[in-house]
């Protein structure tokens, strides 16, 4: 089976481990995008600590789960989003206002939609977490 998206596989593994009540999950392979996505999730308290393990191949990440995550997912293809259109995307993807985050990749890095609005940057939509 071919991997279409490493990020989608990682978030799927986190979702499945969270649903089964696991305390930690191993993600491999890893990438810089996955690490930045996890940093945003960690900043908002959806996951605990995570550790990158360099095995001289593609690397592994061990993520500690807190039980606070309901769902996370990838938006594919990565649509271009203007600053004014971010609100429409959050309304479509998230279950309620002020609940969850849409994660964007911008010229200023990977961040959630609120931080992108504060910095007044737009970019491509990566995924969501709530």
UniProtKB/Swiss-Prot annotation:
Keywords of the record, alphabetical order, are: Ribonucleoprotein, Ribosomal protein
Under the heading PANTHER family, the entry gives:
40S RIBOSOMAL PROTEIN S15A (PTHR11758)
Biological process (GO), any one: translation
Q: Which GO terms describe its molecular function?
A: structural constituent of ribosome
A Gene Ontology cellular-component term: cytosolic small ribosomal subunit
- One Pfam family assigned to this protein is Ribosomal_S8
Q: Which family does it belong to?
A: Belongs to the universal ribosomal protein uS8 family.
Q: Which Gene3D superfamilies match?
A: 3.30.1370.30, 3.30.1490.10
Q: What InterPro entries does the entry give?
A: Ribosomal_uS8, Ribosomal_uS8_CS, Ribosomal_uS8_sf
Cysteines paired by S-S bonds: none
Protein name, UniProt field: Small ribosomal subunit protein uS8
Q: Which domain of life is it from?
A: Eukaryota
Extra facts = There are two genes for S22 in A.gossypii.
